[in-house]
Amino acid sequence: MSQAMQPGDEIPTIKITPDKYLTVRYAGASGDFNPIHIDDDFARRVGLPGKILHGLWTMAQVARAQTEAAGGPHALKRLHVTFRGMGVPEHEITVTGTVDRVDDGVAIVHAVAEQDGRAIIRNAEAELQLE
C-alpha cells in the first residue's frame, strides 16, 4: 500500500485479541511489573475491572498497523498517541487509520485503537516515509 497512499485512504485494519497471559509476558519483556498489569485481585482492589494492558503494548499495535501499511518498520519516522482508556485482556482491539496528507514522499496517518466500542488510543499520528 505504501506507494499508493493518498489522502483519504484507509490503512488496513488490524484486529488483535490479547490473551490472558499477555500482560505477564509483556511485563517480563518490558520490566514493567506494576501489579495492575499482572495481578487481577490487586487491580480489582484499586478499582479496576481486573488487570489491564500496558499502554505501550497497545501503542505498539498502533505502530504495527502503520508499519504494515507502509511496507515495514523502517518507514515509521514518528508516532504520537493520546492514551484515552484502559485496555483489558481477552477483548478484541481494532486499530484503524486514515491518510491525512502526503507531502514529498511522507504520509501523515491518523489512527485510533478501540476496544469494546471505546477509544483506548486516539489522536494517533504517524509519519511514514514512503518508498
Predicted regions and their residues:
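Hydrophobic residues in beta-strands and at strand termini
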Residues: 18, 83, 128-130
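HotDog/MaoC-like acyl-thioester-processing domains
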Residues: 1-11, 87-131
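Hydrophobic beta-strand-centered segment that forms part of the acyl-chain substrate-binding groove
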Residues: 46-99
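Catalytic strand-loop segment that frames the active site of acyl-thioester-processing enzymes
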Residues: 1-51
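Alpha-helix boundary/interfacial micro-motifs
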Residues: 25, 36, 56-57, 72-73, ...
